[in-house]
Amino acid sequence: MRVVRQSGSALSRAKKSRKYTSYRVMNVVLNTLFSFVLAPYIHYILEEISPQWTTREMNTEICFLAKFSFLLVFLFYLNFQGFNSVSNITTSSSPTYDNNRHYGND
C-alpha cells in the first residue's frame, strides 16, 4: 500500500474546501430554520400584537426583522473572522522563537 502525502498548499486547499462546505451547510440549515420555524412564529406574534395589520404590513415587518437579524449574524461573523485572523497572525509572528531556550539567569 502506497501512502501519498499532501503538500502544504494542497492540504490548505482541502481545509478551505471543508470550511467552505461547512459554511454552505450552516447556511442551508439557517435558511431552513428561518423559513419553516421562525417566520411563522414571528407572523403569529405580530398577529397577537396588532391584529388590525394587513398581510402586506405584516410581511413588511417580517422582512424588516429578517434583514435586521441577518445584519446581526453578519456582524457577528465578521467579528469572529477578525479575531480568528488576529490569533493566526500572533501565533505565527515569531518563527525564530524557541520554546526550549531559557532566558535570564537559571
Curated annotation (Swiss-Prot):
GO cellular component labels: membrane
Domain of life: Eukaryota
Protein's cellular compartments: Membrane
Membrane-topology annotation of the record: Multi-pass membrane protein
Residue stretches spanning the membrane: 25-45, 62-82
Keyword Membrane tagged: yes
Entry keywords, A to Z: Membrane, Transmembrane, Transmembrane helix
Note: Partially overlaps HAC1.
Protein name: Putative uncharacterized protein YFL032W
